[in-house]
From Swiss-Prot:
The modification Phosphothreonine is found at T132, T258. It is found in: Cytoplasm; Nucleus. The keyword Phosphoprotein applies. The modification Phosphoserine is found at S123, S125, S131, S310, S436. It comes from the Eukaryota. This is Uncharacterized protein C14G10.04. Signal peptide: none annotated. Residues 44-74 have a biased composition (Basic and acidic residues). Residues 44-95, 120-151, 195-227, 367-497 are annotated as: Disordered. Keywords: Cytoplasm, Nucleus, Phosphoprotein. The keyword Repeat does not apply. Residues 120-131, 213-227, 400-409, 448-472 have a biased composition (Low complexity).
Length: 497
């Protein structure tokens, strides 16, 4: 392996000056210092020439006139727009200003109205259907953007979507919910009694057993132990608490399906029918009178009654209980029901005989003519006799019917006067009785009977004077047949769907 000798620059310069070293003849020229100096000078000279040529070209270009600078294309505007090279993508920026000067501000995307003063290019997001710009002072609505924010809809559109999908908060719709509640109550009432007879004047209910209990019956049975036997009168101070607990007020159904809320005379007394108590079913509105008591309240004893009649009773037709559908077994509920009716009318039966057991075949029914809108005509029982010979009501053959009771009922049936007393505590002057031919008794109904009882005194606790007896609500019975829409109870005058 041969040894490599490395020479430094100083060694090479020393050897070049040595007489022992001879210059080869074919040595390249560029190695010599003179050649290198000459090459350097040549490059400098070429650079100067190139610079001079560049200056000449620029001077010639500045004197050149372009086609854009003709007088027809000159734009009068800010200095930025007055140069021919002030364009973007081959389109003049001043084009929009020309359109504005001509009044064409509705030129679609190219107009400043829709681009918010920004320049329009192919890469711009203004005017594109898929635009998702972060903000814009002008709202360009399109279907795609609305679909992206469908969950953020406000107002009626959002509410209707939630109601259709049963999502979101519950929005109250009183009309629809009330109609649905009416249909439910009508269906439950139809199931509770298959033999219910509904007339415009009188509502009579039979105690037919039901396989499915309604919602109101379930609610009335749920709190029997807590509020059993509490009547409405005890809430307004008409009777003591002990009397209210011992008294069971029968359920009263008014025409039109509207139960009395506060035991008003105008809603409770007119055309009232008392149904026989049943051990299987109870009235839908029993909770308003029995304090949410179920059918068990019919088993209580005979209530305590005051001696004075109540002035809140008028034109009451007392009918015997209809025949229940539980068979031909004898029952002793009739006398007890009669005692309850007397208790509601403010009378106390003079006799204290026990309840007789009456066969079901001996109990007559109430025949009602629905076509008569003013007053329901009731058939006379076969046992009715003139005032000289007082006979007991049908079904109460063993009950001693006193003369006071007969006089009291005759005074209710033969009166044709109407007087409206003021509420307790509002006035001490008794209103005058006003005669109205519209509300007189129908022909052939108890006509010719004289009132055998004198006007009773006011019951304890009433501060006003006793008006002319009997009391009447002051409006014709035809008003009962009108539909009442102000109460939250279903209208049972029409058959359920």
């Amino acid at each position: 392996m041969s040894q490599v000798i490395q020479y430094s620059e100083a060694d090479l310069l020393y050897l070049s000056k040595s007489p022992l070293i001879k210059k080869p003849e074919n040595l390249p020229e560029w190695i010599l210092p003179e050649a290198m100096k000459a090459d350097r000078e040549r490059h400098i000279r070429q650079e100067k020439e190139m610079k001079r040529h560049d200056d000449d070209g620029r001077q010639y270009q500045s004197d050149r006139k372009f086609a854009k600078s003709k007088h027809d294309d000159i734009i009068l505007g800010p200095p930025k727009l007055s140069f021919a090279s002030s364009n973007e993508n081959g389109r003049s920026v001043g084009r929009h200003d020309d359109l504005l000067s001509l009044g064409n501000v509705y030129n679609g995307v190219a107009s400043l109205r829709y681009r918010n003063g920004a320049s329009v290019s192919r890469s711009s997001s203004i005017g594109h259907s898929g635009s998702t710009a972060p903000w814009s002072s002008v709202g360009r609505h399109n279907r795609k953007k609305d679909n992206e924010h469908r969950d953020e809809m406000e107002g009626l559109e959002k509410v209707m979507k939630q109601r259709a999908g049963n999502t979101g908060p519950l929005v109250a719709n009183s009309t629809e919910e009330f109609e649905a509640w009416k249909r439910m109550m009508k269906a439950s009432s139809g199931e509770a009694g298959a033999g219910n007879v509904i007339t415009p004047g009188v509502t009579s209910t039979t105690g037919a057993p039901s396989g499915k209990a309604s919602l109101s019956r379930a609610a009335s049975n749920s709190s029997t132990s807590a509020r059993a036997g509490i009547s409405v009168d005890s809430l307004f101070g008409k009777r003591s608490a002990a009397q209210a607990m011992a008294t069971v007020v029968p359920s009263v159904s008014t025409p039109g399906g509207t139960p009395p809320r506060f035991a008003s005379p105008a809603l409770t007394v007119e055309s009232m029918v008392h149904a026989a108590p049943s051990t299987t079913t109870s009235s839908r509105f029993s909770k308003f009178f029995n304090g949410l008591a179920g059918p068990e309240t019919s088993k209580t004893s005979t209530p305590n009654m005051s001696n004075n009649p109540s002035p809140r009773v008028a034109n009451t037709v007392v009918s015997p209980a209809p025949i229940p559908t539980i068979g031909s077994a004898t029952i002793d509920k009739d006398a007890e029901g009669f005692q309850r009716v007397l208790a509601m009318l403010g009378r106390q039966a003079s006799s204290t005989t026990g309840s007789p057991k009456v066969a079901l075949s001996q109990m007559p029914q109430v025949n009602v003519n629905p076509s008569n809108q003013d007053l329901a005509s009731v058939k006379q029982p076969s046992g009715f006799s003139p005032p000289s010979a007082v006979a007991p009501p049908p079904g109460l053959g063993n009950h001693n019917f006193s003369n006071d009771d007969s006089s009291f009922f005759r005074s209710l049936m033969t009166s044709d006067t109407r007087s409206v007393p003021p509420p307790p505590g509002f006035s001490t002057n008794a209103p005058k009785a006003v005669k109205s031919p519209e509300i007189s008794a129908p022909p052939g109904l108890y006509r010719g009977l004289s009132s055998g009882a004198s006007i009773p005194s006011a019951p304890p606790g009433f501060g006003y004077q006793q008006p002319s007896f009997p009391y009447s609500p002051g409006f014709p019975p035809s008003a009962y047949n009108q539909n009442r829409t102000g109460y939250g109870f279903p209208d049972t005058s029409r058959p359920p769907h």
